[in-house]
């Protein structure tokens, strides 16, 4: 995960100061890419400890099509609480767009079910794409999608994934995003009887919040450790039937947690 540390260095050295919606302010660079070979291990940042439970449950929540934080809270995950309304609702965010995009004809489109079946039917397709950026519903979302689209690519029996992100909280958010899309790629690869290939991140406004700068500098003093491995204990009937206990991260030996405030 040295490439992640190099991105932190890039922002600290080359970032421009920008004001932002949260009022905190950022150091920002534009247009960056990271690549991870999933054959080399599961890309969990090791220079600080990540809350794996939150990463797994959030992805399962997305795949359920759920947009209320109740399921997350019941499973000890609070990462979406700051944006939810008094009833726990977040509007038509990721889960709604992934599982029930509203078409012009009034019908809903399950993009996840479609892309899994299309990978099986037509792995050479250049349309293996899922989007969460529904312009017609952005104003109804408590937080418009930061990671707004992802695309799959099949070659030599391996499934690769590239996701696009308009806004990147590099210290707190990006390590979660990397692990989440790695997990999704492993799950879909298993469902399609493929091995895993590359994971590619493409970011637009890639930033460090000004109240994360010292934490980033501390992280840069730490040496990366070997990547863990992901074990999926069973193959469920569909992409929607995975459970938390199906996943085991083996050999994760991170440096201690580095706390930082969330910019809301």
UniProtKB/Swiss-Prot annotation:
The organism encoding this protein is: Geobacillus kaustophilus (strain HTA426)
Subunit relationships: Homodimer.
Q: What is this protein called?
A: Thymidylate synthase
What task does this protein carry out?
Catalyzes the reductive methylation of 2'-deoxyuridine-5'-monophosphate (dUMP) to 2'-deoxythymidine-5'-monophosphate (dTMP) while utilizing 5,10-methylenetetrahydrofolate (mTHF) as the methyl donor and reductant in the reaction, yielding dihydrofolate (DHF) as a by-product. This enzymatic reaction provides an intracellular de novo source of dTMP, an essential precursor for DNA biosynthesis.
Keyword Ribosomal protein among UniProt keywords: no
Which residues of the sequence carry a binding annotation for (6R)-5,10-methylene-5,6,7,8-tetrahydrofolate? 51, 169, 263
Where do the catalytic residues lie?
Answer: 146 (nucleophile)
Protein's gene: thyA
Cystine connections? none
> What is this organism's lineage?
Bacteria, Bacillati, Bacillota, Bacilli, Bacillales
EC number per UniProt:
2.1.1.45
Annotated catalysed reactions: dUMP + (6R)-5,10-methylene-5,6,7,8-tetrahydrofolate = 7,8-dihydrofolate + dTMP
Alphabetized InterPro entries for the sequence: Thymidate_synth/dCMP_Mease (IPR045097), Thymidate_synth/dCMP_Mease_dom (IPR023451), Thymidate_synth/dCMP_Mease_sf (IPR036926), Thymidylate_synthase (IPR000398), Thymidylate_synthase_AS (IPR020940)
MF GO annotations: thymidylate synthase activity
Q: Which GO terms describe its cellular component?
A: cytosol
């Amino acid at each position: 995960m040295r490439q992640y540390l190099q991105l932190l260095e890039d922002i600290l050295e080359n970032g421009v100061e920008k004001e932002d919606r949260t009022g905190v302010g950022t150091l920002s660079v534009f247009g960056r890419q990271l690549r991870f070979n999933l054959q080399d291990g599961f890309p969990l940042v090791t220079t600080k400890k990540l809350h794996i439970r939150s990463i797994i449950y959030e992805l399962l929540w997305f795949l359920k099509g759920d947009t209320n934080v109740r399921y997350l809270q019941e499973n000890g995950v609070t990462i979406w609480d700051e944006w939810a309304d008094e009833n726990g609702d977040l509007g038509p965010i990721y889960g709604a767009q992934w599982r029930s995009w509203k078409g012009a004809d009034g019908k809903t489109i399950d993009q996840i079910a479609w892309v899994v079946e299309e990978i099986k039917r037509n792995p050479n397709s250049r349309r293996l794409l899922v989007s969460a950026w529904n312009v017609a519903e952005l104003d109804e979302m408590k937080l418009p999608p930061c990671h707004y689209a992802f695309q799959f690519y099949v070659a030599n029996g391996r499934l690769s994934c590239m996701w696009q992100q308009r806004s990147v909280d590099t210290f707190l958010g990006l390590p979660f995003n990397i692990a989440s899309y790695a997990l999704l790629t492993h799950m879909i690869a298993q469902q399609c009887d493929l091995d895993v290939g590359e994971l590619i991140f493409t970011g637009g406004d890639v930033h460090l919040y000004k109240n994360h700068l010292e934490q980033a500098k501390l992280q840069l003093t730490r040496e990366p450790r070997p990547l863990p491995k992901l074990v999926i204990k069973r193959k469920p009937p569909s992409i929607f039937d995975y459970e938390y206990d199906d996943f085991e991260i083996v050999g994760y030996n991170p440096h201690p947690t580095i706390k930082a405030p969330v910019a809301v």
